[in-house]
Curated annotation (Swiss-Prot):
Keyword Signal set for record: yes
A Pfam family the protein falls into: DUF2608
Superkingdom of this protein's organism: Bacteria
Provenance organism: Rickettsia felis (strain ATCC VR-1525 / URRWXCal2) (Rickettsia azadi)
InterPro entries for the chain: DUF2608 (IPR022565)
Signal peptide: 1-19
Protein name: Uncharacterized protein RF_0480
Keywords attached to this entry: Signal
Length: 294
């Protein structure tokens, strides 16, 4: 009787999925884990890799906190407060991204190769970003522009992972400025919705639950939130969160350099325009309600 009970306990213990959050400062450790673990223990279709692009994809235009000289930061504080008081400050990252006058430099020069390696290995890989969908200044649909921009300028393409679900509008979630979160060509644009909530919604909508969910983000709270969301939905998914913390300190410019950039941003923020008319309820499968030509 004792042996039988022990055997049952061992089976239960083996069935439990262990979650883990791992600290990394580059993609090298992650690539090594794929080579030594994931590629050996899982078939590609049982994995899902999620890259959270915010503050991971590009180097910061205006370094903050420990990345910048304390005296310079104190000089800039009043200007930064002016930005934060502006109701359009939520669009600042999107403004920087879409403005050609601001240089964009990858934090990880090998990131395009990493994405391509996953795709070529048939491992599903998607991205999440904190942008807003629909019209933004002179861009008709930001989510479409962003996917095209990454592919054209950096050879980053997430579109191969879910080709049968290349455009999903999450109108079951809350709208913001007459728009909804969107999945377009492998990129989830959160549109002011919790990223963890949106990612789970995506998995449910496409009917895909991986055996191992591998996510890369510089936001530890997001990793914990996603772990909680997955665990609440199913205890059979292995959660691996890579907390990306690049400790390479960028070269500091002087206060005048940053002051000019911030003043320019304030001016640009005040000029931001969005024009998104209310969307009609769309029940036609695969039709894109953002596309006026349909």
């Amino acid at each position: 009787m004792f042996k039988r009970s022990l055997f049952i306990l061992l089976l239960l213990a083996a069935s439990l999925v262990k979650a883990e959050i791992i600290e990394v400062d580059s993609l090298n450790k992650i690539k090594q884990d794929f080579k030594e673990n994931y590629n050996k223990n899982y078939v590609p279709q049982d994995l899902l890799v999620v890259t959270v692009l915010d503050e991971f994809l590009f180097k910061s235009l205006v370094p903050i906190g420990e990345q910048i000289d304390k005296d310079i930061y104190l000089t800039l504080t009043p200007l930064l407060r002016n930005i934060n008081k502006n109701s359009k400050a939520i669009y600042i990252d999107q403004l920087i991204l879409t403005n050609d006058s601001y240089k964009k430099e990858l934090q990880e020069s090998d990131f395009p190769n990493f994405v391509n390696e996953m795709s070529n290995s048939k491992i599903p890989i998607i991205a999440v970003n904190d942008g807003f969908t629909g019209n933004f200044n002179n861009i008709p649909k930001f989510e479409i522009w962003f996917a095209d921009y990454l592919k054209k300028n950096f050879n980053i393409d997430f579109s191969n992972s879910f080709p049968n679900n290349n455009y999903i509008i999450f109108n079951n979630l809350d709208s913001f400025a007459n728009t909804y979160p969107v999945f377009y060509k492998g990129i989830l644009t959160s549109n002011n919705i919790s990223k963890a909530e949106m990612m789970l919604n995506f998995l449910i909508q496409v009917g895909f639950m991986p055996k191992a969910f591998i996510i890369i983000s510089n936001n530890i709270e997001l990793l914990k939130s996603m772990e909680f969301q997955l665990n609440s939905y199913s205890s059979n998914i292995l959660f691996i969160g890579y907390h990306y913390n690049n400790k390479n300190t960028p070269e500091n410019k002087d206060a005048a350099y940053y002051t000019k950039i911030i003043n320019d941003l304030i001016s640009q923020i005040n000029k931001i325009k969005r024009n998104n008319p209310p969307l009609k309820t769309n029940k036609i499968k695969d039709k894109n309600p953002y596309d006026k030509n349909q």
